[in-house]
Amino acid sequence: MRRAISHAKNGEWPISKAVDGVTLDYEARHRRRYRLRTHEGEDVLLDLAEAVAMADGDGLRLEDNSWLTVKAGQEDLIEITTDNPQHLARVAWHLGNRHLLAAINANRILIRPDHVIESMVVGLDARIRHVTEAFQPEHGAYHEHRDTPLSSAS
């Protein structure tokens, strides 16, 4: 089984050397070691030194210096919308207070399905809709930045 041994962000790897791709949901895009199935049906071992938060368009370098393209897979999600940005910010605060993964933009918030949270959001007079899309939530204030590795204190 071939091994994927390093990761590069979208735009920082030679896409012309892509020989195949993998479609991964959010959980599978944040792994260190994992068995992947490529679009062509090949099993590849993801074997990175550390877990990396991969995003759509990133690349995985194989041992032979060829590359796999990472595609964010479609997931069942809840789309939250409101009538104005202030109301959406208020809903975002409540979601953040519960430490939920959320993809936030100017017009909507995407979260994973959770009937308790859905009830809370409706109780805040926001609208919900079930959608199927790629999920790329915010990292949060204390995440490992993709461009600066964390040093470990021993």
Protein language model annotation of sequence segments:
Residues M1-A18, E40, I111-S154:
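Helix-rich terminal scaffold detector
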Residues M1-A51:
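Intrinsically disordered, low-complexity, positively charged segments
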Residues L36-T38, H99, I104-A106:
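Long beta-strand-rich cores associated with HINT superfamily self-processing modules
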Residues M54, L60-L62:
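Short, well-ordered loop/turn sites that connect or cap secondary structure elements
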Residues L68-T82:
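Short glycine-/aliphatic-rich beta-strand segments at the starts of folded cytosolic domains
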Residues Q86, R90-N97:
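Short, solvent-exposed interaction modules
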Residues H94-L95, N105-A106, V116, G123:
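Conserved "landmark" site that anchors the functional core of diverse proteins
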Residues G96-H99, A103, D125-H130:
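A common structural junction motif
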